[in-house]
């Protein structure tokens, strides 16, 4: 089921009255299984939504690009070299003007439990102005790279991705 007609989605009548997506001629989606949901949520006629894959992920199949992103990560966080990289990328909470990130992640416990095989890199949503602080003594293990690398860069580097309802899970 799409978000149309749900408590937080638009009604079919509203979508008819205000066709936000009425000027679209093509919409690309990741697979045939999700075409119906986009047609319903965007109130589009059949044939506009096509399963071609998502062009935004094309770069993830370019080995040179991926390797260059990893090298960029190692320049910023040398501790990541030869370790599994966990990307922690939650979406924002609240309203755009006061957006926040979850602040209950226990980096100390992650460090203790995972040992020397892993590092965590954090990427907060661009709306978040004051992300949680990672203690200085854990910077060898966990680092907030929001200001230094794009989400695309970090997706190339990640062996594991921890997120929530952020749309980036469709790209990973």
Region annotations inferred by a language model:
Residues 1-67:
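Active-site and donor-binding regions of nucleotide-sugar-utilizing enzymes
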Residues 22-27, 119, 157-160:
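Short active-site oxyanion
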Residues 42-43, 88, 92, 147, ...:
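Tryptophan-centric aromatic hotspots in well-structured domains and transmembrane helices
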Residues 52-134:
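Conserved catalytic-core segment of nucleotide-activated headgroup transferases in glycan assembly
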Residues 148-172:
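A donor-sugar binding/catalytic signature common to diverse glycosyltransferases
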Residues 128-147:
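Nucleotide-activated donor-binding/catalytic signature segment of Leloir-type glycosyltransferases, i.e.
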Residues 17, 107, 150-151:
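Acidic, amphipathic alpha-helical patches
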Residues 30-33, 124-126, 165:
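Helix N-cap/beta->alpha junction signal
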């Amino acid at each position: 089921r799409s978000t149309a007609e749900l408590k937080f989605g638009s009604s079919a009548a509203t979508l008819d009255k205000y066709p936000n997506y009425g000027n679209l001629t093509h919409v690309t989606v990741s697979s045939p299984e999700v075409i119906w949901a986009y047609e319903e949520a965007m109130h589009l006629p059949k044939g506009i939504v096509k399963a071609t894959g998502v062009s935004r992920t094309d770069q993830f199949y370019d080995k040179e690009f991926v390797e260059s992103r990893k090298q960029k990560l190692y320049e910023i966080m040398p501790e990541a070299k030869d370790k599994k990289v966990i990307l922690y990328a939650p979406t924002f909470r609240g309203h755009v003007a006061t957006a926040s990130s979850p602040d209950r992640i226990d980096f100390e416990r992650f460090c203790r439990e995972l040992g020397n095989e892993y590092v965590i890199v954090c990427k907060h949503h661009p709306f978040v102005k004051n992300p949680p602080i990672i203690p200085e003594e854990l910077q060898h293990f966990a680092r907030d790279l929001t200001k230094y690398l794009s989400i695309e860069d970090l997706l190339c580097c990640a062996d594991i991705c921890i997120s929530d309802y952020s749309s980036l899970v469709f790209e990973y």
